[in-house]
Amino acid sequence: ASQKRPSQRHGSKYLATASTMDHARHGFLPRHRDTGILDSIGRFFSSDRGAPKRGSGKDHAARTTHYGSLPQKSGHRPQDENPVVHFFKNIVTPRTPPPSQGKGRGTVLSRFSWGAEGQKPGFGYGGRAADYKSAHKGLKGADAQGTLSRLFKLGGRDSRSGSPMARR
């Protein structure tokens, strides 16, 4: 009996540690994902800002209270926030040079997007759609949906021979 008890205890301890480890792993996985997202956001804004953003709002609040209580750190606070504040100021309230850049980029982006939308999908797909519609009209197609359904029926009968696909 004395030999069985420690084995049972070890088994229960092992199960308990395994379950707690599983819980810890499950608890850490989403946290690591969130920190990864926050780190990526922090790196996007400023590499120095990534470390403070790892902590939750509580960390930030504690740091702000520390900054407020200690005058030395309050002097360092604007230095830490300078790049981010500068970045946001450039975005939110652009001064004389940024608006010209913003306008130029906006027009270029809009032209590029219009060109991409108009030429590649518009002409290419439009031409293809016209070809397909004309070919299907010759085959017996009236609407695009009818041609699509007939295409699926033909494809299902010929290649797959699947009854549900053919019925659709």
Swiss-Prot record:
Gene (UniProt): MBP
Annotated positions of the N6-acetyllysine modification: K120
Residues under site feature: Cleavage: F88, K89, F112, S113
Matching Pfam families: Myelin_MBP (PF01669)
Name of this chain's protein: Myelin basic protein
Symmetric dimethylarginine carried by residues: R105
Positions of post-translational Phosphoserine modification: S7, S12, S19, S40, S56, S74, S113, S159, S163
Keywords: Acetylation, Autoimmune encephalomyelitis, Cell membrane, Citrullination, Membrane, Methylation, Phosphoprotein
Positions of post-translational Omega-N-methylarginine modification: R43, R49, R105
Summary of subunit composition and partner proteins: Homodimer.
A single GO molecular function term of this UniProt record: structural constituent of myelin sheath
Matching InterPro entries: Myelin_BP
Chief site of localization: membrane
Post-translational modification: As in other animals, several charge isomers may be produced as a result of optional post-translational modifications, such as phosphorylation of serine or threonine residues, deamidation of glutamine or asparagine residues, citrullination and methylation of arginine residues. Phosphorylated by TAOK2, VRK2, MAPK11, MAPK12, MAPK14 and MINK1.
Function recorded in the entry: Is, with PLP, the most abundant protein component of the myelin membrane in the CNS. Has a role in both the formation and stabilization of this compact multilayer arrangement of bilayers. Each splice variant and charge isomer may have a specialized function in the assembly of an optimized, biochemically functional myelin membrane.
Keyword Hydrolase listed: no
Highest rank taxon of the organism: Eukaryota
